[in-house]
Amino acid sequence: MEARLIESREIAPAVRHFEFEALGVERLEFAPGQFTSFTDVIGGKEITRAYSMASAPLGTNRFELCLNRVEPGHLSPRLFEMKPGDRIEMRQPLGMFVLRQPARDSIFIGTGTGVAPYRSMLQAHLHASSPGFTLLFGVRYESHLLYRTEFEAMAIEYPHFRFWPTLSRPDSTWKGRQGHVQAHLAEAIEDRRNLDFYLCGLKEMVDDVRAVLKGLGFDRKQIFYEKYD
């Protein structure tokens, strides 16, 4: 299967939002939270990298991704150089990082482009009668709060959705939460125990949050995660 780039745009320094279409299918089937893999030959070597879907299934062959340019990277520089109409080999979406059914109140914890699968999940599952969701999103700088306007609009429309952006390196104008996401877990949990937790981001953050949650007495079956280096 091949993917053809429709358009891409910068949404933060060194971060781009991509819209692709999967060729050869009328509808690309996947569950919100899953990932696809791209493959290309770079420097004579076949390189494959996995990227989380950043959109809910659209009922068409189109899908969206959110990628940061890794320097030095193997595949991301190639993707950042792609022009509309360019093609790249892709695989059918896979992955187990999806919302457990039946869904219940959940806390989504993500850093950087690890917010992508949560955008997919929220687009698909957040509605007037859905469980309550909290998105605890950590980045260094305010300029890297990806999809901020979308999440803020969701929080206005659906009072049972809470968007909690957190900056680890804020400037003097920032009035929101500060530090790492781990510091705000207890506030997000309140006194609730009937919760599920979804963790996506760098390995260090995911491991730290898992340890905190286990220390608070939550069962490992309540904790779902996807991590990367």
Regions found by a protein language model. Name each.
Residues 2, 60, 132, 136-229:
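Reductase modules of NAD(P)H-dependent flavoproteins
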Residues 1-84, 140, 169:
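Ferredoxin-reductase
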Residues 33, 114, 202:
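Short, conserved phosphate/pyrophosphate- and ester-handling motifs at nucleotide-, phospho-/glycolipid
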Residues 91-102:
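A short, basic/flexible loop-to-alpha-helix module at the beginning of a structural domain
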Residues 26, 105-106, 194-197:
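Short active-site oxyanion
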Residues 50-61, 100-112, 216:
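Short, compositionally biased
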Residues 115-126:
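Histidine-anchored nucleotide/phosphate-binding helix
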